[in-house]
Amino acid sequence: MNYAAPWWLPGGNLQTIWAALRSRRFLGDQPVFRRERWTTPDRDFVDVDWSVQPKTAGVLRRAKDGREAEKSMGAQPLLVVFHGLEGSSASHYAEAFADVAHSRGWVCAVPHFRGCSGELNLGPRAYHSGDFAEIDWILKRFAIAHAGPVMAVGISLGGNALMRWAAEEGAQARQIVAGVASVCSPLDLAASGWAIGRGFNRQVYTRMFLRSMVPKALKKLDQHPGLFDRDKLLAARDLYEFDNIFTAPLHGFKNADDYWERASAKPHLHRIAVPALALNALNDPFIPPGSLPQPASVGKHVTLWQLATGGHVGFPSGPFPGHVRAMPEAVASFLASQL
């Protein structure tokens, strides 16, 4: 990917924040998503938002059953987008990927991690960065139901989970997906967790995430009294403390340190046996450049794109106010080359 940030957006923070809030996400009409609810293996649910081309949207709209809707989209390639921390199909990158998918004649789907679709999930759990088991059943359902090839991209947290899944599946992943990609993913969770907990990051990004995550966690406590210590959660001031109190114990980890170590994809990248792309920006405020994987530590199936600029899932391009299609276009080109 050849990319240089526009002169009017210097620095990783501006490239991150402006891209998310102000840059254009699509060329024509805003992508329209239509929702299906899937029952999980543990009898919970996830919501999957499909964005399809107009000629297919009518077919999907008429479908009454979720699986019927999945099968109604023909043999076009399917791009599955796993969102980032507290993301959704409304995130700037999700709409941009959907727009790029449409321009290529692809179908796009955004499965929401539990509790991220606007409705709290049922079980005594949420989602986490290393949940390759969740990625597994979701991708396998897509592969079974969809007649065409399946590709997957994960953004930030979703990309780490996707790469963990690819590593766990090994050569079997080729039976499910043609290729995978991670974008600005914290493949070393400890390094990224500490980076986001300091200085400007702590004051801006950490506060933003906690404003969303803490109320959802408290609703989860109302659902399941005694699940965790309410006072300790309210005292959490960074993601480490939040993960220590909520994310780690609810998902089978001893504490935040254990979670960050075991969930990180970086130590497992050499096990990936499906075409995979790991795209990062060296000025990403969330991810120290020294924590990024190097060619010698990944397998032959993993391609590393490490760009000088772009911020965290930003990569704005063009004259003011800019657009964010350059990154999805480049990632889609990589995935298309695997078909």
Residue ranges and their predicted role:
Residues Q53-K55, S72-L122, W137:
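Short, surface-exposed "cap/lid" segments of acyl-processing enzymes
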Residues G310-L339:
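Catalytic active-site module of serine/aspartate enzymes centered on a nucleophile-bearing elbow/loop
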Residues V100, R114-M151:
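Catalytic nucleophile-loop/oxyanion-hole region of alpha/beta-hydrolase
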Residues V298-F315:
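Catalytic histidine neighborhood in serine/cysteine hydrolases
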Residues H146-L250:
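Alpha/beta-hydrolase-fold enzymes
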